[in-house]
From Swiss-Prot:
Mn(2+) 1 binds at residues 75, 77, 103. This is Serine/threonine-protein phosphatase PP2A catalytic subunit. It is an enzyme of class 3 (hydrolase). Binds 2 manganese ions per subunit. One of its GO terms (molecular function) is metal ion binding. Mn(2+) 2 binds at residues 103, 135, 185, 259. It holds the Pfam family Metallophos. The gene is pph-1.
Length: 327
């Protein structure tokens, strides 16, 4: 079959919304300005935004190529004001190229504003920002951990939740920086040996309960060798022998991932084959951790920038208490 592996896993062009008028740059800039001030968009504007974003994302690969320099970020989890701090530390978009590794929603109080802003930036500067899918970019998880309830509270119905969760199906699963640094939300899978295995996946679906797509968003590195059962109930744990072999076989120097709270914002593991980056400081407004982002320059040299929570007077009360289990 004469198919380029780069194109496998993409959505056919005929699925593009044909009756959608392209959003003008002044309109987008107005939306972004409003969102930067933590003001939510009207429901109809969110619908237009998500339709346009789908057109952009459906052309991206399951292993989206990214060029240096770029700044790599971990979980945000609706902590909007800390995202503003991240941009203050790392530079504004599009002055800085960004790669976000998923988990934009749930837990924090401003999931709506956070994910809307990142999606708007993606449409406005598609070659300057890459947004990957995390395990929380899912219909099932967001109904339990806050995003669904927040949408109901802020819009009075579930339409905005549906627009975004439908869009999440189009997010790339992984990214590859200059063919050397492999970025994804969770970790490796026993079903995947090569990047071409990932390119061959059909990603346009809800995150499955098991299988390679699930594993990429749920797995974690572990001190024990080989594959292990994950305490999360999805994905696997994988040892240094697994990450070393994967990096060697695919010509990689590093796996960068998010998904786990690390107290200093970043953490090397598995003899520096893997680095975990977490970008939500004082996670859930109580964990006391620092956050970090990883700056990669044009020579593939990386620097970690750590930051603390943005000072703020207080946060609004949430309508229900979310479960304690940290996903």
């Amino acid at each position: 079959m004469d198919t380029n592996m780069e194109d496998v896993g993409r959505v056919p062009a005929e699925l593009t919304s044909s009756n959608f008028e392209p959003t003008t740059i002044p309109t987008l800039d107005g939306w972004i300005e409003s969102l930067m001030n933590c003001k939510q968009l009207a429901e109809s504007d969110v619908q237009r935004l998500c339709e346009k974003a789908r057109e952009v994302l459906q052309d991206e690969s399951n292993v989206q190529p990214v060029k240096c320099p770029v700044t790599v970020c971990g979980d945000i989890h609706g902590q909007f004001h800390d995202l503003m701090e991240l941009f203050k530390i790392g530079g504004s978009c599009p002055d800085t190229n960004y790669l976000f590794m998923g988990d934009y929603v749930d837990r924090g109080y401003y999931s709506v504003e956070t994910v809307t802003l990142l999606v708007a930036l993606k449409i406005r500067y598609p070659n300057r920002i890459t947004i990957l899918r995390g395990n929380h970019e899912s219909r099932q998880i967001t109904q339990v951990y806050g995003f669904y309830d927040e949408c109901l509270r802020k819009y009075g119905n579930a339409n905005v939740w549906k627009y975004f969760t439908d869009l999440f199906d189009y997010l790339p699963l992984t990214a590859l920086i200059d063919n050397q640094i492999f970025c994804l939300h969770g970790g490796l899978s026993p079903s995947i040996d090569t990047l071409d295995n990932i390119r061959a996946l059909d990603r346009i679906q809800e995150v499955p309960h098991e299988g390679p797509m699930c594993d990429l968003l749920w797995s974690d590195p572990d001190d024990r060798c080989g594959w292990g059962i994950s305490p999360r109930g999805a994905g696997y744990t994988f040892g240094q022998d697994i990450s070393e072999a994967f990096n060697h076989n695919n010509g990689l120097t590093l796996i960068a991932r998010a998904h786990q709270l690390v107290m200093e914002g970043y953490n090397w593991s598995q003899d520096r084959n893997v680095v975990t980056i977490f970008s939500a400081p004082n996670y859930c407004y109580r964990c006391g951790n620092q956050a970090a982002i990883m700056e990669i320059d044009e020579h593939l040299k990386y620097t970690f920038l750590q930051f603390d929570p943005c000072p703020r007077a207080g946060e609004p009360m949430v309508s229900r208490r979310t479960p304690d289990y940290f996903l």
